[in-house]
Amino acid sequence: MFKVKFADIGEGLTEGTVAEVLVKVGDVVKEGQSLYFVETDKVNSEIPAPVAGKIAVINIKAGQEIKVGDVVMEIEDGSDTSATSEPKAETKSEAKVEVVEENASVVGATPVSNDVIVRKQTTTVNKSSTIKATPLARKVAADLNIDLSLVTPTGPNQRILVADIKNHQASSTQLASQPISQPAPTPSPSAHQTIAPTIKVVEPSAPLSWDEVPMNGVRKATVKAMTKSHTEIAAFTGMKNTDITETHKMRTELKDHAAASGIKLTYLAFIIKAVAKSLRDMPNINVRGDFANNKIQFMHNINIGIAVDTPNGLMVPVIKGADHLSVFEIAIKISELANKAKDGKLTRAEMTEATFTVSNFGSVGLDYATPIINSPESAILGVGTMSQTPLYINGELQKRFIMPLSMTCDHRIIDGADAGRFLIKVQDYLSKPVLLFM
Protein backbone atom coordinates (compact mmCIF):
# COMPACT_ATOMS: atom_id res chain seq x y z
CA MET A 1 0.00 0.00 0.00
CA PHE A 2 1.43 3.38 -1.01
CA LYS A 3 0.59 6.30 1.27
CA VAL A 4 0.26 9.52 -0.71
CA LYS A 5 1.30 12.50 1.38
CA PHE A 6 0.73 16.18 0.69
CA ALA A 7 4.23 17.38 -0.16
CA ASP A 8 5.80 20.81 -0.59
CA ILE A 9 5.36 21.37 -4.33
CA GLY A 10 8.34 23.66 -4.48
CA GLU A 11 7.13 27.02 -3.12
CA GLY A 12 8.01 26.57 0.58
CA LEU A 13 4.34 26.13 1.51
CA THR A 14 3.17 24.50 4.75
CA GLU A 15 -0.57 24.10 4.16
CA GLY A 16 -3.26 24.25 1.51
CA THR A 17 -6.97 23.84 0.87
CA VAL A 18 -8.41 20.97 -1.15
CA ALA A 19 -10.44 22.52 -3.96
CA GLU A 20 -11.53 19.28 -5.62
CA VAL A 21 -10.97 15.53 -5.30
CA LEU A 22 -10.65 14.11 -8.80
CA VAL A 23 -10.87 10.37 -7.99
CA LYS A 24 -12.97 8.05 -5.80
CA VAL A 25 -12.30 4.85 -3.89
CA GLY A 26 -11.95 1.94 -6.30
CA ASP A 27 -10.69 3.99 -9.23
CA VAL A 28 -7.67 2.60 -11.05
CA VAL A 29 -5.16 5.37 -11.71
CA LYS A 30 -2.02 5.65 -13.78
CA GLU A 31 1.21 7.16 -12.55
CA GLY A 32 1.04 10.91 -13.17
CA GLN A 33 -2.77 11.01 -13.28
CA SER A 34 -4.24 13.93 -11.32
CA LEU A 35 -5.63 12.91 -7.91
CA TYR A 36 -6.78 16.16 -6.37
CA PHE A 37 -6.66 19.92 -6.84
CA VAL A 38 -5.13 22.03 -4.06
CA GLU A 39 -5.09 25.79 -3.45
CA THR A 40 -2.42 27.59 -1.45
CA ASP A 41 -1.60 31.25 -0.89
CA LYS A 42 1.00 30.98 -3.66
CA VAL A 43 -0.10 28.42 -6.25
CA ASN A 44 -2.95 26.28 -7.51
CA SER A 45 -1.88 22.78 -8.43
CA GLU A 46 -3.27 19.48 -9.64
CA ILE A 47 -1.39 16.82 -7.66
CA PRO A 48 -0.52 13.71 -9.71
CA ALA A 49 -0.38 10.09 -8.59
CA PRO A 50 3.21 9.12 -7.71
CA VAL A 51 2.45 5.45 -8.49
CA ALA A 52 -0.08 3.44 -10.49
CA GLY A 53 -2.71 1.34 -8.72
CA LYS A 54 -6.20 1.32 -7.22
CA ILE A 55 -7.44 4.04 -4.86
CA ALA A 56 -8.01 2.31 -1.51
CA VAL A 57 -8.46 5.18 0.94
CA ILE A 58 -9.30 8.87 0.54
CA ASN A 59 -8.75 11.05 3.61
CA ILE A 60 -9.64 14.43 2.09
CA LYS A 61 -12.67 16.27 0.76
CA ALA A 62 -13.29 19.56 -1.00
CA GLY A 63 -12.83 22.54 1.30
CA GLN A 64 -10.61 20.67 3.77
CA GLU A 65 -7.38 22.28 4.97
CA ILE A 66 -4.32 20.02 4.81
CA LYS A 67 -0.73 20.38 5.95
CA VAL A 68 2.49 19.20 4.34
CA GLY A 69 3.07 15.60 5.42
CA ASP A 70 -0.61 14.69 5.82
CA VAL A 71 -1.58 11.33 4.28
CA VAL A 72 -4.27 12.29 1.79
CA MET A 73 -4.79 8.95 0.02
CA GLU A 74 -3.64 5.34 -0.04
CA ILE A 75 -3.06 3.47 -3.29
CA GLU A 76 -2.89 -0.32 -3.68
CA ASP A 77 0.20 -0.68 -5.83
CA GLY A 78 1.28 -4.20 -4.91
CA SER A 79 3.99 -3.01 -2.53
CA ASP A 80 4.50 -4.06 1.10
CA THR A 81 1.43 -3.05 3.11
CA SER A 82 3.67 -1.73 5.87
CA ALA A 83 5.49 0.64 3.53
CA THR A 84 5.17 4.34 4.27
CA SER A 85 6.85 5.68 1.19
CA GLU A 86 6.98 9.39 0.47
CA PRO A 87 5.90 10.63 -2.98
CA LYS A 88 8.63 10.36 -5.57
CA ALA A 89 10.96 13.31 -5.86
CA GLU A 90 9.85 13.76 -9.45
CA THR A 91 6.40 14.73 -8.20
CA LYS A 92 7.58 18.30 -7.73
CA SER A 93 8.52 18.71 -11.34
CA GLU A 94 5.53 16.72 -12.59
CA ALA A 95 3.01 18.75 -10.66
CA LYS A 96 1.14 21.14 -12.90
CA VAL A 97 1.64 24.42 -11.09
CA GLU A 98 -0.69 27.30 -11.76
CA VAL A 99 0.10 30.58 -10.05
CA VAL A 100 -2.68 32.39 -8.23
CA GLU A 101 -0.85 35.52 -7.26
CA GLU A 102 2.20 37.11 -5.71
CA ASN A 103 1.29 40.39 -4.06
CA ALA A 104 -1.14 40.85 -6.95
CA SER A 105 -3.98 41.75 -4.63
CA VAL A 106 -2.44 45.05 -3.56
CA VAL A 107 -3.00 46.52 -6.99
CA GLY A 108 -6.77 46.45 -6.55
CA ALA A 109 -9.32 44.23 -8.23
CA THR A 110 -9.46 45.94 -11.60
CA PRO A 111 -9.87 43.83 -14.73
CA VAL A 112 -7.27 44.11 -17.45
CA SER A 113 -8.49 45.94 -20.52
CA ASN A 114 -7.00 45.59 -23.96
CA ASP A 115 -8.32 49.06 -24.58
CA VAL A 116 -8.54 52.09 -22.38
CA ILE A 117 -12.24 52.69 -21.91
CA VAL A 118 -13.63 55.85 -23.44
CA ARG A 119 -16.41 57.53 -21.50
CA LYS A 120 -19.93 56.49 -22.58
CA GLN A 121 -18.47 53.48 -24.36
CA THR A 122 -20.51 50.31 -23.82
CA THR A 123 -18.65 47.07 -23.20
CA THR A 124 -19.79 43.48 -23.17
CA VAL A 125 -18.61 41.20 -20.38
CA ASN A 126 -18.12 37.49 -20.92
CA LYS A 127 -20.23 35.94 -18.15
CA SER A 128 -18.25 32.72 -18.04
CA SER A 129 -15.05 34.63 -17.21
CA THR A 130 -16.62 35.85 -13.95
CA ILE A 131 -17.77 32.40 -12.79
CA LYS A 132 -15.60 30.56 -10.30
CA ALA A 133 -14.52 27.14 -11.53
CA THR A 134 -11.43 25.00 -11.31
CA PRO A 135 -9.25 24.96 -14.44
CA LEU A 136 -10.04 21.27 -14.95
CA ALA A 137 -13.78 21.95 -14.68
CA ARG A 138 -13.45 24.73 -17.29
CA LYS A 139 -11.66 22.36 -19.64
CA VAL A 140 -14.32 19.65 -19.21
CA ALA A 141 -17.11 22.20 -19.72
CA ALA A 142 -15.43 23.49 -22.88
CA ASP A 143 -15.00 19.94 -24.22
CA LEU A 144 -18.69 19.18 -23.57
CA ASN A 145 -19.84 22.61 -24.80
CA ILE A 146 -21.56 23.34 -21.47
CA ASP A 147 -22.35 26.90 -20.40
CA LEU A 148 -20.82 27.38 -16.93
CA SER A 149 -23.53 29.89 -15.99
CA LEU A 150 -26.07 27.03 -16.08
CA VAL A 151 -24.11 24.78 -13.72
CA THR A 152 -24.87 24.66 -9.98
CA PRO A 153 -21.60 24.92 -7.99
CA THR A 154 -20.96 22.73 -4.94
CA GLY A 155 -17.28 23.49 -4.34
CA PRO A 156 -15.78 25.82 -1.76
CA ASN A 157 -16.61 29.50 -2.24
CA GLN A 158 -19.28 28.58 -4.83
CA ARG A 159 -16.67 27.15 -7.21
CA ILE A 160 -17.72 24.75 -9.95
CA LEU A 161 -16.07 21.33 -9.78
CA VAL A 162 -15.76 18.61 -12.42
CA ALA A 163 -18.45 16.65 -10.57
CA ASP A 164 -20.83 19.59 -11.01
CA ILE A 165 -20.22 19.55 -14.77
CA LYS A 166 -20.97 15.82 -14.93
CA ASN A 167 -24.09 16.18 -12.77
CA HIS A 168 -25.34 18.97 -15.00
CA GLN A 169 -24.71 16.88 -18.11
CA ALA A 170 -26.53 13.91 -16.58
CA SER A 171 -29.56 15.97 -15.56
CA SER A 172 -29.69 17.66 -18.97
CA THR A 173 -29.61 14.28 -20.70
CA GLN A 174 -32.35 12.98 -18.43
CA LEU A 175 -34.57 15.98 -19.10
CA ALA A 176 -34.01 15.70 -22.83
CA SER A 177 -35.17 12.06 -22.80
CA GLN A 178 -38.43 12.82 -20.97
CA PRO A 179 -41.60 13.47 -23.02
CA ILE A 180 -42.62 17.07 -23.05
CA SER A 181 -46.11 17.72 -21.74
CA GLN A 182 -47.99 20.78 -22.86
CA PRO A 183 -48.42 23.09 -19.86
CA ALA A 184 -51.73 24.71 -19.18
CA PRO A 185 -51.86 28.24 -20.55
CA THR A 186 -51.31 30.93 -17.97
CA PRO A 187 -52.47 34.49 -18.34
CA SER A 188 -49.64 36.81 -19.25
CA PRO A 189 -49.28 39.96 -17.16
CA SER A 190 -50.48 43.14 -18.75
CA ALA A 191 -48.12 45.93 -19.62
CA HIS A 192 -49.10 47.69 -16.39
CA GLN A 193 -48.53 44.66 -14.14
CA THR A 194 -45.24 43.99 -12.41
CA ILE A 195 -44.04 40.81 -10.73
CA ALA A 196 -42.76 41.49 -7.23
CA PRO A 197 -39.35 39.93 -6.52
CA THR A 198 -38.96 37.54 -3.60
CA ILE A 199 -37.48 39.51 -0.72
CA LYS A 200 -36.05 38.01 2.44
CA VAL A 201 -37.54 40.15 5.19
CA VAL A 202 -35.54 40.65 8.38
CA GLU A 203 -37.33 42.09 11.37
CA PRO A 204 -35.81 45.44 12.43
CA SER A 205 -35.53 44.14 15.99
CA ALA A 206 -33.66 40.98 14.95
CA PRO A 207 -30.06 40.68 16.20
CA LEU A 208 -27.24 41.29 13.73
CA SER A 209 -26.60 38.20 11.61
CA TRP A 210 -24.29 37.20 8.77
CA ASP A 211 -22.95 34.40 6.62
CA GLU A 212 -19.34 33.26 6.86
CA VAL A 213 -17.17 32.06 4.00
CA PRO A 214 -13.63 30.76 4.64
CA MET A 215 -10.90 32.78 2.94
CA ASN A 216 -9.30 30.98 0.02
CA GLY A 217 -5.61 31.16 -0.84
CA VAL A 218 -6.06 34.26 -3.00
CA ARG A 219 -7.83 36.19 -0.26
CA LYS A 220 -5.25 35.16 2.36
CA ALA A 221 -2.48 36.49 0.12
CA THR A 222 -4.50 39.67 -0.41
CA VAL A 223 -4.76 40.25 3.33
CA LYS A 224 -1.04 39.68 3.80
CA ALA A 225 0.07 41.90 0.91
CA MET A 226 -2.29 44.81 1.59
CA THR A 227 -1.44 44.82 5.29
CA LYS A 228 2.25 44.91 4.43
CA SER A 229 1.81 47.77 1.96
CA HIS A 230 -0.31 49.95 4.25
CA THR A 231 1.73 49.41 7.39
CA GLU A 232 5.24 49.62 5.94
CA ILE A 233 5.11 52.02 2.97
CA ALA A 234 4.87 55.80 3.27
CA ALA A 235 2.81 56.20 0.12
CA PHE A 236 1.74 59.36 -1.71
CA THR A 237 -0.17 59.74 -4.98
CA GLY A 238 0.26 62.36 -7.69
CA MET A 239 -2.29 62.84 -10.47
CA LYS A 240 -2.09 64.40 -13.93
CA ASN A 241 -4.39 64.79 -16.94
CA THR A 242 -2.42 63.64 -19.97
CA ASP A 243 -3.12 64.66 -23.56
CA ILE A 244 -2.81 61.48 -25.65
CA THR A 245 -4.43 62.83 -28.82
CA GLU A 246 -1.39 61.99 -30.95
CA THR A 247 -1.24 58.47 -29.51
CA HIS A 248 -4.93 58.11 -30.35
CA LYS A 249 -4.25 59.16 -33.95
CA MET A 250 -1.29 56.79 -34.32
CA ARG A 251 -3.20 53.86 -32.88
CA THR A 252 -6.08 54.55 -35.28
CA GLU A 253 -3.65 54.55 -38.21
CA LEU A 254 -1.84 51.36 -37.16
CA LYS A 255 -4.72 49.33 -35.72
CA ASP A 256 -5.80 47.66 -38.97
CA HIS A 257 -2.19 47.03 -39.99
CA ALA A 258 -1.57 45.30 -36.67
CA ALA A 259 -4.80 43.32 -36.91
CA ALA A 260 -3.70 41.95 -40.29
CA SER A 261 -0.81 40.32 -38.41
CA GLY A 262 -3.09 39.01 -35.68
CA ILE A 263 -2.12 41.74 -33.19
CA LYS A 264 -4.67 43.67 -31.14
CA LEU A 265 -3.01 47.06 -30.81
CA THR A 266 -4.16 48.67 -27.58
CA TYR A 267 -3.72 51.95 -25.75
CA LEU A 268 -2.25 49.94 -22.89
CA ALA A 269 0.59 48.79 -25.14
CA PHE A 270 1.53 52.43 -25.84
CA ILE A 271 1.29 53.32 -22.14
CA ILE A 272 3.51 50.44 -21.03
CA LYS A 273 6.11 51.32 -23.66
CA ALA A 274 6.03 54.97 -22.53
CA VAL A 275 6.46 53.87 -18.91
CA ALA A 276 9.35 51.56 -19.81
CA LYS A 277 11.21 54.29 -21.71
CA SER A 278 10.56 56.77 -18.89
CA LEU A 279 11.97 54.32 -16.35
CA ARG A 280 15.08 53.98 -18.50
CA ASP A 281 15.38 57.78 -18.57
CA MET A 282 14.74 58.08 -14.82
CA PRO A 283 16.34 55.10 -13.02
CA ASN A 284 15.60 56.73 -9.66
CA ILE A 285 11.97 55.59 -10.08
CA ASN A 286 12.85 51.98 -10.94
CA VAL A 287 14.09 51.26 -7.42
CA ARG A 288 13.57 49.08 -4.37
CA GLY A 289 14.47 49.82 -0.78
CA ASP A 290 16.77 47.63 1.31
CA PHE A 291 15.76 49.37 4.50
CA ALA A 292 17.40 46.83 6.80
CA ASN A 293 20.78 47.87 5.39
CA ASN A 294 19.88 51.50 4.59
CA LYS A 295 20.43 51.02 0.85
CA ILE A 296 18.51 51.82 -2.33
CA GLN A 297 18.59 49.20 -5.08
CA PHE A 298 18.57 50.62 -8.62
CA MET A 299 17.08 47.83 -10.71
CA HIS A 300 18.84 46.95 -13.97
CA ASN A 301 15.73 45.28 -15.40
CA ILE A 302 12.54 47.03 -16.44
CA ASN A 303 9.76 44.51 -15.85
CA ILE A 304 6.20 45.86 -15.96
CA GLY A 305 3.39 44.10 -14.09
CA ILE A 306 -0.19 44.40 -15.40
CA ALA A 307 -3.25 43.75 -13.25
CA VAL A 308 -5.59 41.04 -14.57
CA ASP A 309 -8.90 40.11 -12.93
CA THR A 310 -9.59 36.37 -13.29
CA PRO A 311 -12.21 33.90 -12.02
CA ASN A 312 -9.64 32.65 -9.49
CA GLY A 313 -8.72 36.12 -8.22
CA LEU A 314 -6.49 39.01 -9.17
CA MET A 315 -3.16 38.23 -10.81
CA VAL A 316 -0.31 40.46 -11.97
CA PRO A 317 1.60 38.82 -14.83
CA VAL A 318 4.84 40.52 -15.74
CA ILE A 319 6.11 41.79 -19.10
CA LYS A 320 9.85 41.33 -18.65
CA GLY A 321 12.34 43.53 -20.46
CA ALA A 322 9.56 45.86 -21.59
CA ASP A 323 12.09 48.53 -22.56
CA HIS A 324 13.54 46.15 -25.17
CA LEU A 325 10.16 45.31 -26.72
CA SER A 326 8.34 47.23 -29.44
CA VAL A 327 4.80 48.52 -28.99
CA PHE A 328 3.57 45.65 -31.17
CA GLU A 329 5.50 43.08 -29.14
CA ILE A 330 4.10 44.51 -25.91
CA ALA A 331 0.58 44.27 -27.35
CA ILE A 332 1.20 40.58 -28.09
CA LYS A 333 2.51 40.02 -24.56
CA ILE A 334 -0.54 41.70 -23.01
CA SER A 335 -2.91 39.39 -24.89
CA GLU A 336 -0.87 36.26 -24.18
CA LEU A 337 -0.46 36.91 -20.46
CA ALA A 338 -4.06 38.04 -19.94
CA ASN A 339 -5.39 34.90 -21.65
CA LYS A 340 -3.07 32.63 -19.67
CA ALA A 341 -4.13 34.35 -16.45
CA LYS A 342 -7.82 33.83 -17.18
CA ASP A 343 -7.21 30.17 -18.13
CA GLY A 344 -5.15 29.55 -14.98
CA LYS A 345 -2.03 28.69 -16.96
CA LEU A 346 0.44 31.30 -15.73
CA THR A 347 3.75 30.01 -14.43
CA ARG A 348 5.37 31.44 -11.32
CA ALA A 349 8.13 32.90 -13.51
CA GLU A 350 5.47 34.93 -15.33
CA MET A 351 4.16 36.31 -12.03
CA THR A 352 7.36 37.48 -10.35
CA GLU A 353 10.20 40.02 -10.59
CA ALA A 354 8.12 43.05 -11.58
CA THR A 355 9.89 46.36 -10.93
CA PHE A 356 6.88 48.61 -11.66
CA THR A 357 3.15 47.96 -12.08
CA VAL A 358 0.43 49.50 -14.29
CA SER A 359 -3.19 49.25 -13.10
CA ASN A 360 -5.90 50.13 -15.60
CA PHE A 361 -8.77 51.09 -13.29
CA GLY A 362 -10.21 53.16 -16.13
CA SER A 363 -11.62 49.87 -17.40
CA VAL A 364 -14.18 50.01 -14.59
CA GLY A 365 -15.00 53.68 -15.18
CA LEU A 366 -12.74 55.42 -12.65
CA ASP A 367 -10.97 58.65 -13.53
CA TYR A 368 -8.63 58.88 -10.55
CA ALA A 369 -7.64 56.58 -7.70
CA THR A 370 -4.80 55.95 -5.27
CA PRO A 371 -3.41 52.60 -6.44
CA ILE A 372 -1.56 50.62 -3.79
CA ILE A 373 2.10 49.79 -4.37
CA ASN A 374 2.86 46.17 -5.15
CA SER A 375 5.67 45.56 -2.63
CA PRO A 376 8.66 45.23 -2.97
CA GLU A 377 8.22 47.67 -5.86
CA SER A 378 8.29 51.38 -5.06
CA ALA A 379 5.78 52.82 -7.53
CA ILE A 380 2.62 52.02 -9.47
CA LEU A 381 0.83 53.91 -12.25
CA GLY A 382 -2.97 53.96 -12.43
CA VAL A 383 -4.68 54.63 -15.77
CA GLY A 384 -8.07 56.36 -15.70
CA THR A 385 -10.92 56.62 -18.19
CA MET A 386 -10.03 58.46 -21.39
CA SER A 387 -12.39 61.29 -22.37
CA GLN A 388 -12.76 63.84 -25.16
CA THR A 389 -12.22 67.35 -23.80
CA PRO A 390 -12.20 70.81 -25.42
CA LEU A 391 -8.86 72.54 -24.80
CA TYR A 392 -7.24 75.74 -26.01
CA ILE A 393 -4.13 74.89 -28.06
CA ASN A 394 -2.18 77.93 -29.27
CA GLY A 395 -5.26 80.10 -28.80
CA GLU A 396 -7.51 77.72 -30.73
CA LEU A 397 -10.22 75.55 -29.15
CA GLN A 398 -9.65 71.90 -30.10
CA LYS A 399 -11.10 68.51 -29.22
CA ARG A 400 -8.41 66.53 -27.38
CA PHE A 401 -8.24 63.02 -25.94
CA ILE A 402 -7.35 63.27 -22.25
CA MET A 403 -6.30 60.40 -20.02
CA PRO A 404 -6.00 60.81 -16.22
CA LEU A 405 -2.90 59.21 -14.70
CA SER A 406 -2.45 58.53 -10.97
CA MET A 407 0.97 57.50 -9.67
CA THR A 408 1.59 56.21 -6.15
CA CYS A 409 5.18 56.17 -4.87
CA ASP A 410 7.05 55.13 -1.75
CA HIS A 411 8.02 58.52 -0.32
CA ARG A 412 10.87 56.96 1.64
CA ILE A 413 12.96 56.57 -1.51
CA ILE A 414 11.10 58.55 -4.21
CA ASP A 415 10.64 62.30 -3.85
CA GLY A 416 7.43 64.00 -4.92
CA ALA A 417 9.27 66.23 -7.38
CA ASP A 418 10.75 63.18 -9.13
CA ALA A 419 7.31 61.58 -9.33
CA GLY A 420 6.03 64.74 -11.03
CA ARG A 421 8.92 64.72 -13.48
CA PHE A 422 8.22 61.07 -14.26
CA LEU A 423 4.56 61.74 -15.07
CA ILE A 424 5.61 64.59 -17.35
CA LYS A 425 8.11 62.26 -19.03
CA VAL A 426 5.37 59.69 -19.68
CA GLN A 427 3.16 62.48 -21.03
CA ASP A 428 5.92 63.62 -23.39
CA TYR A 429 6.18 60.16 -24.93
CA LEU A 430 2.41 59.81 -25.29
CA SER A 431 2.12 63.29 -26.85
CA LYS A 432 4.87 62.37 -29.36
CA PRO A 433 4.32 58.62 -29.83
CA VAL A 434 6.77 58.44 -32.74
CA LEU A 435 9.45 58.51 -30.01
CA LEU A 436 8.17 55.15 -28.78
CA PHE A 437 9.28 53.58 -32.06
CA MET A 438 12.82 54.95 -31.89
UniProtKB/Swiss-Prot annotation:
Cofactor descriptive note: Binds 1 lipoyl cofactor covalently.
Segments for region (Disordered): 172-192
Residue positions where N6-lipoyllysine is found in the record: K42
Chain intervals with Polar residues compositional bias: 172-181
Cofactor dependence: (R)-lipoate
Annotated catalytic residues: H411
GO cellular component: cytoplasm
InterPro entries: 2-oxoA_DH_lipoyl-BS, 2-oxoacid_DH_actylTfrase, 2-oxoacid_DH_E2_comp, Biotin_lipoyl, CAT-like_dom_sf, E3-bd_dom_sf, PSBD, Single_hybrid_motif
Catalytic function, reaction form: N(6)-[(R)-dihydrolipoyl]-L-lysyl-[protein] + acetyl-CoA = N(6)-[(R)-S(8)-acetyldihydrolipoyl]-L-lysyl-[protein] + CoA
GO MF: dihydrolipoyllysine-residue acetyltransferase activity; lipoic acid binding
CDD domains membership: lipoyl_domain (cd06849)
Enzyme class: transferase
Physiological role: The pyruvate dehydrogenase complex catalyzes the overall conversion of pyruvate to acetyl-CoA and CO(2). It contains multiple copies of three enzymatic components: pyruvate dehydrogenase (E1), dihydrolipoamide acetyltransferase (E2) and lipoamide dehydrogenase (E3).
PANTHER family: DIHYDROLIPOAMIDE ACETYLTRANSFERASE COMPONENT OF PYRUVATE DEHYDROGENASE COMPLEX (PTHR43178), LIPOAMIDE ACYLTRANSFERASE COMPONENT OF BRANCHED-CHAIN ALPHA-KETO ACID DEHYDROGENASE COMPLEX, MITOCHONDRIAL (PTHR43178:SF5)
Subunit (UniProt): Forms a 24-polypeptide structural core with octahedral symmetry.
Protein family per UniProt: Belongs to the 2-oxoacid dehydrogenase family.
Protein name: Dihydrolipoyllysine-residue acetyltransferase component of pyruvate dehydrogenase complex
Organism: Mycoplasma capricolum subsp. capricolum (strain California kid / ATCC 27343 / NCTC 10154)
